[in-house]
Amino acid sequence: MKTSALFVIFGLVLLFCNSFAAELKTTGRGCGGLMAGCGGKSTFCCSGYNCSPTWKWCVYARPGRR
């Protein structure tokens, strides 16, 4: 009984991941969200995020931060 419940949960997780990946592929998202890698040349951060020069990933844009 426990094994079949785990298989059902695992199947639902796989279905969710597959649909999420298909959605990302169709939208063609060209900007990065929180902690997405950014370089400033080919990859950019979405609105509300800035590319951290130290870590090279997108961080929250704060007032007063350059």
UniProtKB/Swiss-Prot annotation:
InterPro entries the record matches: Huwentoxin-1, Huwentoxin_CS1
Cell location: Secreted
Disulfide bonds: C31-C46, C38-C51, C45-C58
Tissue specificity of this protein: Expressed by the venom gland.
Transmembrane segments annotated in the record for this chain: none
Proregion residues excised on maturation: 22-29
Record GO cellular component, one term: extracellular region
Highest taxon listed in the record's lineage: Eukaryota
The UniProt record lists the keyword Metal-binding: no
Matches recorded under Pfam families: Toxin_12
UniProt main location, coarse: secreted
Entry keyword annotation includes Nucleus: no
GO molecular function: ion channel inhibitor activity; toxin activity
Residues annotated as signal peptide: 1-21
Keywords from the named record: Disulfide bond, Ion channel impairing toxin, Knottin, Secreted, Signal, Toxin
Family statement drawn from the similarity comment of this UniProt entry: Belongs to the neurotoxin 10 (Hwtx-1) family. 46 (Jztx-7/10/12) subfamily.
Domain-related comment: The presence of a 'disulfide through disulfide knot' structurally defines this protein as a knottin.
Role, per record: Probable ion channel inhibitor.
Name of the protein described by the UniProt record: U1-theraphotoxin-Cg1b
